[in-house]
């Protein structure tokens, strides 16, 4: 398998993992139970995405997934509860990971630069929420980031 084929497998598998994450979170949102199986599954999804992104050098994805993994580890350890606020944060984080994956397929430099700048702003905002949760705070949605102007 050459590098482009391996990258395609990565993209496909991450897409499936993100779909799984979304299904788990939507189920938890509509029928909150905080079951160990759900928590473990969410942790594994984020852990796998982090590791796979690291193998390919997709640092932006790996760093973001690392903080999500740390948060999910706190949930697994019983330090955090999988409540509605956390589910909503994880859904937004899942969408952000999906957008980061889409950026990998953008070929035009100017479009990639604008999209990347917008995603950087979004990532900064989400990471502040994730890190606040890790440090013991509640989920308080950060202000919407300003979109970068097209160049």
Regions found by a protein language model. Give the residues of each.
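Non-catalytic helical tethers at domain boundaries
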Residues: 1-151
């Amino acid at each position: 398998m050459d590098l482009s084929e391996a990258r395609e497998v990565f993209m496909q598998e991450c897409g499936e993992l993100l779909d799984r994450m979304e299904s788990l979170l939507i189920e938890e949102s509509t029928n909150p139970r905080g079951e160990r199986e759900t928590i473990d599954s969410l942790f594994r999804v984020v852990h796998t995405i982090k590791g796979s992104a690291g193998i390919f050098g997709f640092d932006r994805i790996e760093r973001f997934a690392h903080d999500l993994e740390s948060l999910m580890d706190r949930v697994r350890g019983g330090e955090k509860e999988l409540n509605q606020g956390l589910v909503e944060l994880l859904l937004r984080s899942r969408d952000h990971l999906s957008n980061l994956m889409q950026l990998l397929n953008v070929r035009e430099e100017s479009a990639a630069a604008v999209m990347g700048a917008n995603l950087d702003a979004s990532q900064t905002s989400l990471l502040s929420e994730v890190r606040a949760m890790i440090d013991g705070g509640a989920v308080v949605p950060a202000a919407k980031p300003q979109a970068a102007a097209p160049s």
